[in-house]
UniProtKB/Swiss-Prot annotation:
<dbReference type="Pfam" id="PF02261">
    <property type="entry name" value="Asp_decarbox"/>
</dbReference>
<feature type="binding site">
    <location>
        <begin position="73"/>
        <end position="75"/>
    </location>
    <ligand>
        <name>substrate</name>
    </ligand>
</feature>
<keyword id="KW-0068">Autocatalytic cleavage</keyword>
<dbReference type="GO" id="GO:0004068">
    <property type="term" value="F:aspartate 1-decarboxylase activity"/>
</dbReference>
<keyword id="KW-0566">Pantothenate biosynthesis</keyword>
<feature type="active site" description="Schiff-base intermediate with substrate; via pyruvic acid">
    <location>
        <position position="25"/>
    </location>
</feature>
<protein>
    <recommendedName>
        <fullName>Aspartate 1-decarboxylase</fullName>
        <ecNumber>4.1.1.11</ecNumber>
    </recommendedName>
</protein>
<comment type="subunit">
    <text>Heterooctamer of four alpha and four beta subunits.</text>
</comment>
<keyword id="KW-0670">Pyruvate</keyword>
<keyword id="KW-0704">Schiff base</keyword>
<keyword id="KW-0210">Decarboxylase</keyword>
<comment type="function">
    <text>Catalyzes the pyruvoyl-dependent decarboxylation of aspartate to produce beta-alanine.</text>
</comment>
<dbReference type="GO" id="GO:0006523">
    <property type="term" value="P:alanine biosynthetic process"/>
</dbReference>
<comment type="pathway">
    <text>Cofactor biosynthesis; (R)-pantothenate biosynthesis; beta-alanine from L-aspartate: step 1/1.</text>
</comment>
<dbReference type="InterPro" id="IPR003190">
    <property type="entry name" value="Asp_decarbox"/>
</dbReference>
<keyword id="KW-0865">Zymogen</keyword>
<dbReference type="GO" id="GO:0015940">
    <property type="term" value="P:pantothenate biosynthetic process"/>
</dbReference>
Amino acid sequence: MLLTMLKAKLHRATVTQADLDYEGSIAIDRDLLDASGILPNEQVDVLNITNGARFTTYAIEAPRGSKVIGVNGAAARLVQKNDLVIVVTYCQMPAEEARNYAPTVVLLDEGNLIKKAA
C-alpha cells in the first residue's frame, strides 16, 4: 500500500506579487526551492492563511535571492500581496518507508527569509 505523505513545506511565506495575466503557476525564489526540495514544475498546494483559500498549481523558479512568492494566472484572484501562505508538496511511498520518513519544513519570516529549515 502506498501512502501520500508531506514531502516539503514552505510555512508562512509572504505573497510578494499576484499577476492575473500570467499563464499560471507560483513563482518561488530559487533559494527557497533549494531549501525545501521543491522542484520547478512540481505540483504544489497553496494554503492561504490570510483568507482560507486553497488551490493547486505548479512551482516555477523566481530569481535566486529575490524573496519572490508570486501567484500567477487564475489563482491570482485567490491571493493579495502580503497574504501569508503555506506551500506544500506531497510524495507517495510504501507504508513501511513512511513510518521513518521526515518531510522538509522551511519556516519563513515576514520577508521570506529562512528562519529554520529541517
